[in-house]
Design a protein with these regions (language model features):
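Basic, flexible linker segments flanking DNA-binding modules
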Residues: 1-45, 136, 190-201
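Mobile genetic element proteins and their domesticated derivatives, centered on retroelements
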Residues: 6, 10, 49, 66, ...
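RNase H-like polynucleotidyl transferase catalytic core
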Residues: 19-22, 105-109, 124-142, 158-163
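An active-site-proximal beta-strand-loop segment
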Residues: 44-75, 81-83
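Active-site beta-loop-alpha junctions of metal-dependent nucleic acid enzymes
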Residues: 59, 77-99, 111
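Short, surface-exposed connector motifs at secondary-structure boundaries
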Residues: 71-75, 99-104
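C-terminal domain-tail junction helix/linker
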Residues: 125-127, 149-209
Length: 209
């Protein structure tokens, strides 16, 4: 049954036909956001996302994961009860100072990533944001694959008694993933040895007020 027939039935029954909602568009920022960009070198494209889990008492844990799509290295995992756009900025600030600034960052349209303060700050540093189509996680395949490994290899098999325990075990897993775990796309070598340390690009890292 198509939508026109449904509307005819509604009118026949004297019901008000609801106005059609405009199809939600992905976020356009005039910076190539809708281009499916493939990573070509280190710091070309980073991507980040969230994973959810719980402690044994049922309280939620929110996990921010961030990777370099080219090297596959997990640059950080932040674990807390809640993570806001300001927490995202704090994590990015630390990485930009210690690792350098990427050309692009890919993410979904979560409010923590699309917040005006985050977009403005990244734009001022020259970082282009790549937002995927809503409901299309396959467009963010690198981080989705990483998050799947995190779930399968750790989260699904662990019962975290406390938030602190979760932080310790997840960070331990991240280090093993980077330094020991072989990756098929890297010739069955771990991501971290593939990383060439470059001098961070010069930039003033100030949080937008």
């Amino acid at each position: 049954m198509n939508h026109k027939r449904v509307e005819r039935i509604w009118r026949r029954e004297g019901l008000k036909v609801p106005k059609r909602q405009a199809k939600r568009k992905r976020l356009w920022l005039n910076d190539g956001s809708c281009i499916r960009l493939r990573p070509q070198y280190k710091d070309h494209v980073w991507s980040y996302d969230f994973v959810m889990t719980r402690t044994h008492d049922g309280r939620p844990i929110k996990i921010l994961t961030l990777i370099d799509e080219f090297t596959r290295e997990c640059l950080c995992i932040r674990v807390n009860r809640n993570i806001t756009s300001w927490d995202v900025l704090e994590e990015l600030s630390t990485l930009f100072i210690t690792r350098g600034i990427p050309e692009h960052i890919r993410s979904d349209n979560g409010t923590e990533f699309t917040a005006k303060v985050v977009r403005k700050w990244l734009s001022e540093l020259g970082v282009k944001t790549l937002f995927i189509e809503p409901g299309s996680p396959w467009e963010n395949g690198y981080i989705e694959s990483f998050n799947g490994k995190l779930r399968d290899e750790l989260l699904n098999g662990e019962i975290f008694m406390t938030l602190l325990e979760a932080k310790i075990l997840i960070e331990s897993w991240r280090r093993e993933y980077n330094e020991i775990r072989p990756h098929s796309a890297l010739g069955y070598r771990p991501p971290a040895p593939e990383v060439i340390c470059l001098q961070p690009k010069s930039a003033t890292l100030s949080v937008v007020q």
